[in-house]
């Protein structure tokens, strides 16, 4: 993805290394400069509203209901921090909700810019994209922003269970190509069936450990 930093590696794992760790909700914060203790590597999760971000976070840590699945997309405007033993998972607000006001969109951009620019402990970003959907204008804008941030990014295609196997491979190839990537540079997941969850958890943990070393 252009001038961004080294991509998060796409790992292969038989067992989810995050599901066995204790996890707690730290809090929701409006200030991207918030200090959390202890200072641990952070992995941020970002995607369009309704991309399945909360469901994926719950699947990653093996805790159904930890991250609340909102019935009102576009309402979350805070940074949600979850602490595991060696890292934080940070749930960033979803983007692209059609009913958001102009002021809400401006506030979102300010929050996101502030987070990407100021977090010294940010080890990487997991960017979620619905595998059934082509890139939207908002997705392309997010791609530019992530590239400019020079942070490590792993694109993750969600909702793989919604497609047949043949359609899944086709969409994986098409969407990766739209990002100027190859299929081995992205991850494909399903929170419902568990497809790709252990591999993604391994990638997340590896990125955090590299930041800590």
What are these regions (language model features)?
Residues 39, 65, 78, 104-108, ...:
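Helical mechanochemical/support elements of P-loop NTPase systems and associated helical scaffolds
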Residues 113-184:
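Conserved C-terminal guanine-recognition region of P-loop GTPase G domains, centered on the G4
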């Amino acid at each position: 993805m252009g001038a961004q930093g080294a991509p998060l590696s796409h790992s292969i794992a038989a067992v989810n290394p995050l599901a066995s760790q204790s996890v707690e909700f730290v809090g929701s914060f409006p200030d991207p400069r918030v200090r959390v203790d202890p200072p641990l590597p952070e992995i941020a999760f970002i995607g369009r509203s309704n991309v399945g971000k909360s469901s994926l976070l719950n699947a990653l840590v093996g805790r159904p209901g930890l991250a609340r699945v909102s019935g009102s997309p576009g309402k979350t405007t805070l940074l949600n921090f979850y602490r595991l033993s060696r890292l934080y998972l940070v749930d960033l607000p979803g983007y692209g909700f059609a009913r958001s006001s102009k002021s809400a969109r401006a506030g979102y951009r300010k929050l996101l810019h502030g987070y990407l620019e100021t977090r010294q402990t940010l080890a990487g970003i997991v960017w979620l994209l619905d595998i059934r959907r082509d890139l939207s204008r908002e997705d392309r804008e997010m791609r530019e922003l992530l590239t400019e941030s020079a942070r490590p990014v792993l694109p993750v295609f969600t909702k793989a269970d919604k497609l047949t196997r043949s359609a899944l491979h086709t969409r994986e190839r098409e969407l990766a190509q739209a990002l100027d990537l190859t299929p081995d540079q992205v991850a494909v997941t399903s929170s419902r069936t568990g497809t790709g969850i252990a591999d993604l958890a391994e990638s997340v943990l590896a990125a955090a450990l590299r930041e800590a070393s």
